Amino acid sequence: MNKKQQAVGGIQWGRMLKKLNPYTIQKGFRYLKHYGPKEFWIRLHERFEPEEVPYGPWYEAYIPDAAELEKQKKHKFGYTPQISVAVPAFRTPEVFLRQMIQSLLDQTYPNWELCIANGSPEDTAMAAVLKEYSSRDRRICVRNLDENLGIAGNTNAALTMAGGEFVGLLDHDDLLAPNALYEIVKKLNEDRQLDVVYTDEDKVTTDLSEHFQPHLKPDFNCLLYTSDA
């Protein structure tokens, strides 16, 4: 193994160890049980193989700094639609639940509502966290379901809570960049005929220190959208 291979291997294992926690281990076991060892190994390789083009430096170069975020908070749009963010939640680890909610509270665009359908009625700790935030900010709405309805049922329950002009879906362990809703509303102000806005996405480590595996989506292409690609 040459020095380059050693370095790459070190990065792979270092990244893997950095992402290991009870939640990711549990998800890994579920994936292994559902898809089998072959698909699990392919997935593991995809997640931890080194990036051909480093994403971290690009990300750091393009994220808005504190001054830009403050400028966005003061900006007045002519059109200020309410955006509902629907979240189906089920046995969400507290660290991810708090990070997800905080990412909404950190938005530079203020006219949003967070609609959480809680499918874990037996999880008193999770209910306490949700009550803590919903009592603090009226934009955070929680519906405690009588039982877990599954991902589809919980999602539909969250969607029924939405009262905004636009609705977005967010997984219970996902985050929004602080300027995410601002950029969406900026685009809606540029073209009032828009019905749908889609965005790029990436993954982030549990401690939020490293962004990786970006999914940078192309401009809208009707032929591509309707193809099997």
Features from the language model and the residues they span:
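Short aromatic/hydrophobic "clamp" motif used to bind/position activated sugar donors
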Residues: 167
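The conserved acidic donor/metal-binding loop of glycosyltransferases
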Residues: 171-175, 200
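Conserved small/polar residues in nucleotide/adenosyl-binding loops
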Residues: 225-229
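Short alpha-helix within the catalytic core of nucleotide-sugar-dependent glycosyltransferases
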Residues: 101-102, 127, 156, 164, ...
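Glycine-rich, basic loop-to-helix element that forms the pyrophosphate-binding segment
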Residues: 145-162
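Acidic donor-binding segment of Leloir-type glycosyltransferases
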Residues: 105-144
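Conserved donor NDP-sugar-binding/catalytic core segment of glycosyltransferases
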Residues: 179-211
